């Protein structure tokens, strides 16, 4: 035996989530570089990284040893938590590891952040496992350190009984507390009881210098600063992946511990099968699964053809039948008939149970079999879609249907699958959250104690690009790189962040991925559950699940399907009441001019995929007039086409500004016209790349899909091979070599931008359905859209504003009219949903609505409180209802209602108390007290109350519904602004033209520019719309005091377009509040009197009123109306006043009391 050989048997990767720092492949690479022959992975309580570790080890020529470190409570030492490391020696051992870990999660045995097993489970799942005792943290270790020698024999008896020859005393020498003491006692026990020992290093990080990074990672997980972390004391700087030589030297006094590490590695031989796929058997009774699929498909084809065509002639039938037979042949040959039938079954169940299902998504929409089985609603032949893009018979590929369900009912479908195939056979798929560039800077900065502002400003310099790394951030933001080079603190923070970037931080659940196993999931992979043992999730991610032979089914939630379903139900309910024919959203014509007129006008708010500002700009330029254009829109609106110039070419060709060629005016071929005609000669879709290869170069569609993939991946070797095949095939078809080369070059260029047409068609269909609903049933559609986003105030505000612009009346929230959701009344008005009122919640509202529907309308606040449970309808709920205007139906001032809450709640509690104890004798006196309370006088609804009322309304609704603060000043503002409301700004030719606007400030954000200058971004609301206003340093320095929430500002500046949103914004040149504007622009204040009011008594009242006003510069005039001649008089000079809000309030009251008119200019 070579005493310099050693194998690490206790190693934690970053899949231990907290306890390990290194990626499995990094551990393997270092091991190979150090000349090691084998390595283990023993993550804490999981096998998350087992497959990745296994595959990487084989890739690098290293023997993988699969294990896990577990915890359990030892009954021998007063139920204290202890550790064990388990290693699989064979397939049985690997299976038992899976069962042990899965059982721990299913039973929900959690202690702090760790899941635990029960020791007794080891007695039944012992086959194929080697146990390492756990060192100081093990059951034996803790017993030895406490000197409880009497318990040792009982402890060892268990391991001798069930793991004789497979149990090792683990020796760890990382210089932590008690390790040497334990080591000495363990070696003595080894000699006296003839138990073998083995050396490990309890590896947690790759290199010695990573210890600091490891401690920071632990502190991040704890949520404390580095110096406050306590758990880090459990670790040592020596827990890195040491060389064999270092380990042999470390245990030179106990050579058998080194030798046994190698011996154990030789005993561990796990082989994980791959390349075979396992699906549950679909019940076809006596028919073979293949023939059953053929029968179902042919029946489905007959129904589809009869539905789609008035007359099915022989040519049409053969076209579809030949395609169907081809697909069925491929599906059955590749062994996937069960997959299609399983998907067919749960989709049909969903439809039968009124759960909306999307028309398709991804390449699955290219399958005719899927269409005739009602898996999709897209006819692939009509839209020229390719099956081979979905399932390629010429390469190893798996079917993968992405299925959209109604967001609210998706879980019902998953529960149906669980019921059908068994709870033990169905699980969702795990995902791993990693430390991302922005987040890791914040986390590391916080742990190292840097100030919040410093961390925040630094993290903001990382671009928002999805998946961006810190390395990429340097190249994209030169300021970040400059700061890194010049500032030591920033350099330190980023250097640490780089080492933690990408490290696994937490586990999550795939958005829709579900696996269905032919037997128990644990026959293939371990499962993870929540702390109650529910909601099983595979411990392998989607790639590793596929490796072990399980196929993924995607159950995705799509909010738009919920909107469509809600709208259609509302529409059909009203149609049935009117004895009219109901609508079927899947049967609407795809060429209605009314829809395309709405689209061309860019009125796409609420329309699926088409409502962003950027998309609206593209719609405006393209002016789509057919369904194919909508398909193209979805494919064009991506960074590649937008940045490449492809979009401009497409638009210019559509409008005749550029010649249509197939595909290029210099290099084209007439054979490509049928393929490219619908996209004006532009290669837009991946399917077009495949068809061009088929037509020009004789590729099969399977081989054309391989070409497409090679072009997308830009693999130089593969591309060189494909180039030769393409040119040779084209020449065989009589195509000029030079032309073949040029067209291949064009294919290569556009393939990188090409989009999956099958996906684009399916989503274009959903887009069109929402467009059709908005065009034909706007109220129902908008109400449904609002309900679907009822918790998203910003979206509600946008949809309400859009509805008002469409001419739809919005009925404000009303406790006697509204429901939780938005709905449409018999006059096509939208009734505001109480669920959109901030801070109330679903249950209180449902409680109120249920009571109202059962026992009638509420007469007043007291009635409301006494008919509802005071524990559910709390003070907070009542305040929000009143502030939102939901109680305006009681015809009382909101301030008054707010003042009654205390009495109303008191009365309610007294009422329920009397009711509970059935003290009927008390009801008489209670009613008398209640009547006294109700006789309180109403408060005056003054102007200041109105302002507060609207401010509160905006606070709980996010918008103004019953009025607008700016309405009070509408006439006055016209004098300053020349009627330039936000809704009219789009009519301006706003280049180089300064204009003036006014609005109430509803949002204030501050940003710091690259030059360290502060800018402020305001959102102004003028009741007709919103406008973004940017204020730079110069103006900010002199006007910052004027900028306050809920205050009116008058802003002059220059309009331009936001580059990202394509929305209008203003760069401010000057800012005024109302007082400053009045000083600058108001000429006079005029009091208009009738002829009867020209008596001395009335003039004296006016005189007395103005005597108390502040002097200023605005003169006061009296305008007298006469039958024959009107006249105007200027008052004495001392009546020069300052127009303030206070004056306007008092004037408002004074003028109403005296029935006269006031004019401000």
UniProtKB/Swiss-Prot annotation:
It is an enzyme of class 2 (transferase). Pfam families: DNA_pol3_alpha, DNA_pol3_finger, HHH_6, PHP, tRNA_anti-codon. It catalyses: DNA(n) + a 2'-deoxyribonucleoside 5'-triphosphate = DNA(n+1) + diphosphate. Its main location: cytoplasm. It comes from the Bacteria. Its EC number is 2.7.7.7. One of its GO terms (cellular component) is cytoplasm. CDD domains: DnaE_OBF, PHP_PolIIIA_DnaE1. GO terms for biological process: DNA replication. The keyword Protein biosynthesis does not apply. It is found in: Cytoplasm. GO terms for molecular function: 3'-5' exonuclease activity; DNA-directed DNA polymerase activity; nucleic acid binding. Keywords: Cytoplasm, DNA replication, DNA-directed DNA polymerase, Nucleotidyltransferase, Transferase. DNA polymerase III contains a core (composed of alpha, epsilon and theta chains) that associates with a tau subunit. This core dimerizes to form the PolIII' complex. PolIII' associates with the gamma complex (composed of gamma, delta, delta', psi and chi chains) and with the beta chain to form the complete DNA polymerase III complex. Belongs to the DNA polymerase type-C family. DnaE subfamily. DNA polymerase III is a complex, multichain enzyme responsible for most of the replicative synthesis in bacteria. This DNA polymerase also exhibits 3' to 5' exonuclease activity. The alpha chain is the DNA polymerase. This is DNA polymerase III subunit alpha. The gene is dnaE.
């Amino acid at each position: 035996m070579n005493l310099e050989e050693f194998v690490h048997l206790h190693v934690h990767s970053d899949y231990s989530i907290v306890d390990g720092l290194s990626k499995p492949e990094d551990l393997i690479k270092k091991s190979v570089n150090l000349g090691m022959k084998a390595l283990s992975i023993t993550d804490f309580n999981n096998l998350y990284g087992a497959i990745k570790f296994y595959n990487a080890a084989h890739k690098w020529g290293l023997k993988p040893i699969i294990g896990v470190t577990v915890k359990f409570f030892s009954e021998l030492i007063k139920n204290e938590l202890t550790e064990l490391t388990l290693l699989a020696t064979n397939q049985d051992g690997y299976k038992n590891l899976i069962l042990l870990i899965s059982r721990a999660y299913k039973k929900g045995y959690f202690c702090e952040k760790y899941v635990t097993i029960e020791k007794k489970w080891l007695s039944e799942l012992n086959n194929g496992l080697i146990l390492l005792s756990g060192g100081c943290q093990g059951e034996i270790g803790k017993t030895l350190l406490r000197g409880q020698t009497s318990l040792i024999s009982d402890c060892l008896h268990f391991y001798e009984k069930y793991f004789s020859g497979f149990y090792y005393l683990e020796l760890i020498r990382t210089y932590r507390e008690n390790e040497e003491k334990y080591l000495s006692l363990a070696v003595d026990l080894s000699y006296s009881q003839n138990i073998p020992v083995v050396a490990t290093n309890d590896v947690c990080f790759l290199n010695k210098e990573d210890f600091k990074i490891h401690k920071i990672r632990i502190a991040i997980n704890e949520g404390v600063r580095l110096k406050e972390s306590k758990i880090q004391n459990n670790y040592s700087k020596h827990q890195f992946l040491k060389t064999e030589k270092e380990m042999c030297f470390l245990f030179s006094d106990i050579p058998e511990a080194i030798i046994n590490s190698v011996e154990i590695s030789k005993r561990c031989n796990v082989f994980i099968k791959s390349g075979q796929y396992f699906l549950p058997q679909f019940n076809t009774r006596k028919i073979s699964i293949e023939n059953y699929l053929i029968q179902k498909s042919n029946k489905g084809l007959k129904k589809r053809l009869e539905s789609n065509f008035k007359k099915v002639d022989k040519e049409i039938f053969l076209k579809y039948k030949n395609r169907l037979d081809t697909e069925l042949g491929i599906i059955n040959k590749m062994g996937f008939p069960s997959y299609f039938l399983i998907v067919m079954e749960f989709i049909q169940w969903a439809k039968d149970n009124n759960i909306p299902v999307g028309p398709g998504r991804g390449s699955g929409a290219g399958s005719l079999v899927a269409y005739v089985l009602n898996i999709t609603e897209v006819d692939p032949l009509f839209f020229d879609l390719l099956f081979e893009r979905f399932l390629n018979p010429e390469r190893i590929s798996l079917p993968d249907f992405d299925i959209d369900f109604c967001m609210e009912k998706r879980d019902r479908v998953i529960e149906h699958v669980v019921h059908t195939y068994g709870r033990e056979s169905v699980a969702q798929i795990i995902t791993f959250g990693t430390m991302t560039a922005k987040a890791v800077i914040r986390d590391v900065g916080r742990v190292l104690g840097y100030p919040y502002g410093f961390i925040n400003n630094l993290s903001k310099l990382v671009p928002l690009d999805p998946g961006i790394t810190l390395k990429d951030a340097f190249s994209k933001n030169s300021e970040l790189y400059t700061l890194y080079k010049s500032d030591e603190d920033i350099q330190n923070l980023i250097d640490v962040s780089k080492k933690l970037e990408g490290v696994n931080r937490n586990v999550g659940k795939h958005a829709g991925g579900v696996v269905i196993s032919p037997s128990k999931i644990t026959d293939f992979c371990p499962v993870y559950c929540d702390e109650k043992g529910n909601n099983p999730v595979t411990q392998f991610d989607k790639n590793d699940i596929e490796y072990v032979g399980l196929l993924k089914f995607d159950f995705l939630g799509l909010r738009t399907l919920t909107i469509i379903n809600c709208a259609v139900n509302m529409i059909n309910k009203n149609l049935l009441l009117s004895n009219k024919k109901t609508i079927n959203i899947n049967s609407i014509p795809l060429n209605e001019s009314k829809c395309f007129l709405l689209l061309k006008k860019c009125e796409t708010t609420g329309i699926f995929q088409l409502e962003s500002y950027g998309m609206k700009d593209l719609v405006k330029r393209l002016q789509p007039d057919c369904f194919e254009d909508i398909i193209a829109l979805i494919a064009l609106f991506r960074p590649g086409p937008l940045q490449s110039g492809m979009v401009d070419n497409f638009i210019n060709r559509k409008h005749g500004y550029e010649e249509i060629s197939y595909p290029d005016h210099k290099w084209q071929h007439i054979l490509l016209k049928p393929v490219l005609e619908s996209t004006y000669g532009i290669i837009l879709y991946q399917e077009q790349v495949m068809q061009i290869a088929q037509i020009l170069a004789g590729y099969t569609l399977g081989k054309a899909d391989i070409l497409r993939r090679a072009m997308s991946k830009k693999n130089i070797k593969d591309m060189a091979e494909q180039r030769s095949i393409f040119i040779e095939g084209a020449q065989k078809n009589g195509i000029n070599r030079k032309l073949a080369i040029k067209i291949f070059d064009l294919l290569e260029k556009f393939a990188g931008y090409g989009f999956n047409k099958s996906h684009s068609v399916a989503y274009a269909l959903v887009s069109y359905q929402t467009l059709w609903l908005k065009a034909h049933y706007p109220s129902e559609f908008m109400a449904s859209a609002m309900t679907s986003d009822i918790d998203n105030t910003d979206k509600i505000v946008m949809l309400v504003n859009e509805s008002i612009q469409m001419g739809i009346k919005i009925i404000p929230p009303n406790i006697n009219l509204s429901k939780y959701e938005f709905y449409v009344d018999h006059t096509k008005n939208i009734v505001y949903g109480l669920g959109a009122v901030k801070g109330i919640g679903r249950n209180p509202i449902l409680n109120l609505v249920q009571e109202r529907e059962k026992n009638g309308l509420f007469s007043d606040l007291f009635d409301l409180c006494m008919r509802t449970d005071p524990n559910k309808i709390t003070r907070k709920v009542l305040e929000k209802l009143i502030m939102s205007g939901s109680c305006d139906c009681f015809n009382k001032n909101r301030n008054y209602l707010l003042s009654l809450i205390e009495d109303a709640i008191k009365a309610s509690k007294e009422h329920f108390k009397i009711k509970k104890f059935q003290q009927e004798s008390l009801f008489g006196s209670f009613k008398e007290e209640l009547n006294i309370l109700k006789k309180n006088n109403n408060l005056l609804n003054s102007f200041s109350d109105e302002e507060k009322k609207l401010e509160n309304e905006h606070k709980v609704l996010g918008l103004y519904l019953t009025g607008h603060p700016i309405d009070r000043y509408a006439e006055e503002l016209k004098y300053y602004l020349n009627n330039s409301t936000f809704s009219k700004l789009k009519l301006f030719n706003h280049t180089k033209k300064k204009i003036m606007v006014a609005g109430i400030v509803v949002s204030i954000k501050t940003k710091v520019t690259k030059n360290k200058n502060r800018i402020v971004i305001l959102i102004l609301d003028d009741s007709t719309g919103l406008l973004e206003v940017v204020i730079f340093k110069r103006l900010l320095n002199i006007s910052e005091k004027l900028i306050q929430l809920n205050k009116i500002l008058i802003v002059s500046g220059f309009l331009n377009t936001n580059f990202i949103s394509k929305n209008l914004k203003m760069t401010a040149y000057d800012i005024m509040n109302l007082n400053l504007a009045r000083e600058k622009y108001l000429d006079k204040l005029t009091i208009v009197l009738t002829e009867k009011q020209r008596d001395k008594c009335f003039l004296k009242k006016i005189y007395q009123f103005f005597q108390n006003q502040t002097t200023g510069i605005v003169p006061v005039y009296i305008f007298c109306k006469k039958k024959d001649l009107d006249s105007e008089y200027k008052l004495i000079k001392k009546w020069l006043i300052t127009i303030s809000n206070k004056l306007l309030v008092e004037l408002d009251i004074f003028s109403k009391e005296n029935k006269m008119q006031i004019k401000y200019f």
